[in-house]
């Protein structure tokens, strides 16, 4: 959160736009832990020097937008920006352009636009670390099959073997082989 010497942050953008079309882990965090995300975001915003806070969420997530708008309504420093559903909207440079209308120049860092971008999951992790004294040892992962018959979110410890992810999602057959729907994705 410390910008390079000579660069100053004007905005903290919390990225609530999933980077891939079938991911839903950020959406679930925003609908289930919105208050914690906002508290973690507020901590980061203040560390950056009381900059403006923006939460970018794709418009195909109306429940998350509604929840976050309701929460931020009491904070003058925060704004929720609904974003067009466009791949890869969750990319850092694309998000800055969509939210601020500023392009990150080639061979430059995002801070050159005055923006610091953090994921909503990072804001949640900051809350957990500072308020609950919990280290970041888990992450939420979406497991989705190509035919979308399986689409679930799981919280796993960092370093968990991929076979355990797939087994938990029901992607393995009785012999321990990957099911056909998942074989296309993995």
Model-identified regions with their sequence ranges:
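Hydrophobic alpha-helical positions that pack around
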Residues: 2-4, 50-162, 168-178
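Histidine-anchored nucleotide/phosphate-binding helix
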Residues: 31-47
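Beta-strand/loop-dominated core regions that host nucleotide or nucleotide-derived cofactor-binding catalytic loops
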Residues: 181-185
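Hydrophobic alpha-helical hairpins/lids featuring a short glycine-rich hinge
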Residues: 1-14
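Mid-sequence acidic-hydrophobic segments that form the walls
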Residues: 15, 44-47, 71
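Gly-rich Lys/Arg/Thr-decorated short loops/hinges at beta-loop-alpha junctions or inter-strand turns
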Residues: 12-26, 147
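Short alpha-helix boundary/capping segments
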Residues: 25-36, 157
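Metallocofactor- and cofactor-centric catalytic cores in central/energy metabolism, strongly enriched
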Residues: 26-31, 47-50, 56
């Amino acid at each position: 959160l410390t910008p390079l010497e000579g660069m100053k942050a004007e905005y903290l953008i919390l990225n609530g736009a999933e980077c891939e079309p079938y991911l839903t882990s950020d959406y679930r965090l925003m609908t289930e832990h919105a208050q914690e995300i906002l508290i973690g975001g507020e901590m980061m915003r203040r560390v950056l020097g009381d900059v403006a806070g923006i939460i970018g969420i794709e418009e195909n997530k109306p429940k998350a937008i509604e929840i976050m708008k309701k929460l931020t309504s009491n904070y003058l420093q925060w704004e929720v920006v609904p974003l067009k559903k466009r791949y890869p909207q969750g990319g850092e440079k694309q998000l800055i352009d969509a939210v601020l209308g500023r392009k990150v120049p080639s061979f430059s860092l995002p801070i050159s636009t005055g923006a610091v971008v953090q994921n909503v999951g990072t804001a949640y992790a900051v809350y957990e670390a500072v308020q609950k004294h919990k280290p970041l040892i888990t992450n939420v992962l979406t497991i989705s099959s190509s035919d979308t018959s399986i689409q679930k979110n799981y919280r796993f410890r960092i370093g968990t073997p991929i076979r355990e992810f797939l087994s938990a999602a029901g992607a393995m057959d009785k012999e321990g082989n990957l099911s056909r729907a998942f074989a296309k994705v993995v």
